[in-house]
Amino acid sequence: MAIVSSVPLASKSCLHKSLISSIHKLKPFCRTIPTLGMSRPGKYVMPSMSMSSPVSDDGVQRRTGGYHSNLWNDDIIQFLSTTYGEPAYRERGERLIDEVKNMFNSISMEDVEFSPLNDLIQRLWIVDSVERLGIDRHFKNEIKSTLDYVYSYWTQKGIGCGIESVVPDLNSTALGLRTLRLHGYPVSAEVLKHFQNQNGQFACSPSETEGEMRSIVNLYRASLIAFPGEKVMEEAEIFSTKYLKEALQKIPVSSLSREIGDVLEQDWHTNLPRLEARNYIDVFGQDTKDTKLYMKTEKLLELAKLEFNIFQSLQKTELDSLLRWWKDSGFHHITFSRHLHVEYYTLASCIAIEPQHSRFRLGFAKACHVITILDDMYDVFGTIDELELFTAQIKRWDPSATDCLPKYMKRMYMILYDMVNEMSREAETAQGRDTLNYARQAWEDFIDSYMQEAKWIATGYLPTFDEYFENGKVSSGHRVAALQPILTMDIPFPHDILKEVDFPSKLNDLASAILRLRGDTRCYKADRARGEEASCISCYMKDNPGATEEDALSHINAVISDVIKGLNWELLNPNSSVPISSKKHVFDVSRALHYGYKYRDGYSVSNIETKSLVMRTLLESVPF
């Protein structure tokens, strides 16, 4: 299993041709968007989710996954705006960038608006604002200087609002802890203990003022960046979660209440920077009454809106390229599988928001889409004989090896072959060395893990948890989804760095583990109903006689929590010899793929939250 759920494969006769799933028309969605279910512009048809066992063209009955059809067709391009690609908007953006840089500099020039009693929180506020609005890439030097200044005043008790503050401040300390830690500064979570009373509760007044609530918001946000063994961060998360949920029941609807709701919804390891920026744009500075602060938020907000919309013109070009690849590769002939290339491109655009990372976005979308097709081929459509043949032939990496394969497998063989070669050429341009054989080995290991699961399905074998989990981390697909796309970036990955972010590194192991664990908690019931027994849940129950599903889920959720903390440490360890910039995109791939499982199996049921993500971050511009 990969980043999708699975159903049992048929293991009888060999089939050489694809099946065609029937599509049933159900109730329409309220929003008009382009889909393959449209019979004419403006008419949306919800695709079918029915299960079936159709007879293929050569008379052999094969299972289908019952997944709904592709939600998007080529008309999606029409919905992407190119208006903000005009030079005038870019020129306005450049002027705003200069003005925001002046905002950073004005703090250091002792502007009358700032004083030694509030300068630390003001500095942290502007750094936090540009990061949450998705515009921080323009201010790397300013952010570094600002955080160096804040860190120079950091103490074992935290910091106050300003350099001359006598008493440490919870809001400043919590925001400082989070921001400094995310930038690799060695700050200890122990500072939070100074804000706890004897009962372990965090000191706050019962008045629930806006300032009080913002302190707890930042305490909650800081608690999510926990490292293994930090009990005070666990206590902070429990306290702040309860406090904020109760506060939402009492305070009136406002930008603050919406921000609190968004923060509680956006847990750290499924947080997508572009989605966060889109949501924060809607609440940033809405209720600001201070005239000078309002002028600052307006500049930041205008720049954030421009950046968001300008990026859409680039997305249109990239998506057009992806759709051509999908069509030219013949994916429309592969009717037994899900087609999620648009969804995967959206996820890529949400984690790699820098314009220069086009090859990463397209490479990630292509790799993930191929993973999905292979998953459905191994779990649903292929027979054991066909799959064993495909597994053996792919290791030859020779187009002539397709002669003995069924027609549908020939197509997939060549798609994989061409994609791996294409991205290897791009990687050689970026990295200055040949990585083709390295990438091929990663794909071979991945396909071997699929073959192992196919054998378990065919024989009805239920492995032990450890046996299943070790194979499942490979079959999660995280490694092959991340490896070649990151190598196409303008970030150097010499061998000594690559081995610290790719297999067999701890970072890769944990990222793969969380995808397998969370994926199984979202998919196991549907998989079991279709006849596939093996999952983390069922294997845990086998190893622990008498354990219930609830026991298994509780255990796995606890493991996931620990894995997230371990991932935080692998990314942010201040003593690591590997820079955060080299690890960040592997970490972000984990976040993107994990997002697909945040609410449900969003890769098999992509017409709810996953569809909403496409609409909000790809198709809809931000209004001015």
From Swiss-Prot:
Localization terms from the record: Plastid, Chloroplast
This protein's record includes keyword Lyase: yes
Gene3D superfamilies: Farnesyl Diphosphate Synthase, Terpene synthase, N-terminal domain
One GO term describing the cellular component: chloroplast
Residue span of the annotated presequence: 1-48
Binding site for Mg(2+) 2: 375, 379
Gene Ontology biological-process entries: diterpenoid biosynthetic process; green leaf volatile biosynthetic process; monoterpenoid biosynthetic process
Residues binding Mg(2+) 1, per UniProt: 375, 379
Annotated pathway: Terpene metabolism; oleoresin biosynthesis
Enzyme class, first EC level, given as a word: lyase
Keywords annotated in UniProt: Chloroplast, Lyase, Magnesium, Metal-binding, Plastid, Transit peptide
Obligatory cofactor(s): Mg(2+); Mn(2+)
GO molecular function annotations of the record: lyase activity; magnesium ion binding; terpene synthase activity
Catalysed conversion reaction: (2E)-geranyl diphosphate = (-)-beta-phellandrene + diphosphate
Pfam families recorded: Terpene_synth (PF01397), Terpene_synth_C (PF03936)
Top-level taxon in the UniProt lineage: Eukaryota
CDD domains registered for this protein in UniProt: Terpene_cyclase_plant_C1
EC number from the UniProt entry: 4.2.3.52
Protein family: Belongs to the terpene synthase family. Tpsd subfamily.
Role of this protein: Terpene synthase (TPS) involved in the biosynthesis of monoterpene natural products included in conifer oleoresin secretions and volatile emissions; these compounds contribute to biotic and abiotic stress defense against herbivores and pathogens. Catalyzes the conversion of (2E)-geranyl diphosphate (GPP) to (-)-beta-phellandrene.
Protein name as it appears in the record: (-)-beta-phellandrene synthase 2, chloroplastic
Source lineage: Eukaryota, Viridiplantae, Streptophyta, Embryophyta, Tracheophyta
